């Protein structure tokens, strides 16, 4: 979104008090409880500083449509010890996601914050476990023809031809109840023998 609630870390009490220091503690507490019961946790990485506080508790991460093209987020992904999904652009552009995967797969050197809080030069090894998330653009892109087209782009970029589909956002026309319709289509693609979709992203309140 252009403006709006940025999440638990940024504004933990949803009252525009922006008590980020408390949000970081709450986020770690929630993630530790989730990990304690043996459930893997995922998170979207909005900025490049907060991951230092939570990345050890994250099993999978996402880079949003508006930040997939950001060089600093690609560098961040190159150093994270978890699979990272890059969403296609808000206009439906897949190439920015394939470019991001290629960039994140390579080593990088950049300024960041060390675990002790000091500004440091960071060297990453590259993250080969990155993938595309289809989230729709000017129109939904979850149907088989769009999945096939995206996988063809991945193959052309010499990347694995498999991806994740976001049931929400532009794929549901921002109507949460339409996620069921999208999920039904994805299930039929898999039932018909497609191996191109390995997972889905669902928006809900658990």
Residue map of PLM features:
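Active-site-facing alpha/beta catalytic cores
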Residues: 2-142, 146-147, 169-170, 174, ...
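A structural signal for short secondary-structure junctions
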Residues: 126, 157-159, 192-195
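Redox- and metal-dependent alpha/beta enzyme cores, enriched for Fe-S-associated oxidoreductases
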Residues: 150-158
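Conserved, mostly hydrophobic/aromatic
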Residues: 165
């Amino acid at each position: 979104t252009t403006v709006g609630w940025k999440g638990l870390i940024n504004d933990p009490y949803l009252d525009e008090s922006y008590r980020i220091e408390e949000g970081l503690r709450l986020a770690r507490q929630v993630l530790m409880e989730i990990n304690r019961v043996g459930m893997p946790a995922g998170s979207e990485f909005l900025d490049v500083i907060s991951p230092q506080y939570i990345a050890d508790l994250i099993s999978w991460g996402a880079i949003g449509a508006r930040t997939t093209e950001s060089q600093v987020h690609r560098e961040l992904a190159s150093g994270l010890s978890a699979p990272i999904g890059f969403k296609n652009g808000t206009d439906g552009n897949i190439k920015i996601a394939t470019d991001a995967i290629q960039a994140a797969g390579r080593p990088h050197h950049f300024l960041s914050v060390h675990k002790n809080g000091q500004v440091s030069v960071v060297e990453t090894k590259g993250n080969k476990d990155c993938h595309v998330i289809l989230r729709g653009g000017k129109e939904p892109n979850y149907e088989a023809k769009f999945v096939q087209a995206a996988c063809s782009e991945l193959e052309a970029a010499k990347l694995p031809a498999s991806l994740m589909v976001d049931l929400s956002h532009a794929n549901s026309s921002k109507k949460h109840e339409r996620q069921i319709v999208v999920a039904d289509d994805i299930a039929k693609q898999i039932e018909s023998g497609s191996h191109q979709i390995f997972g889905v992203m669902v928006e809900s309140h658990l």
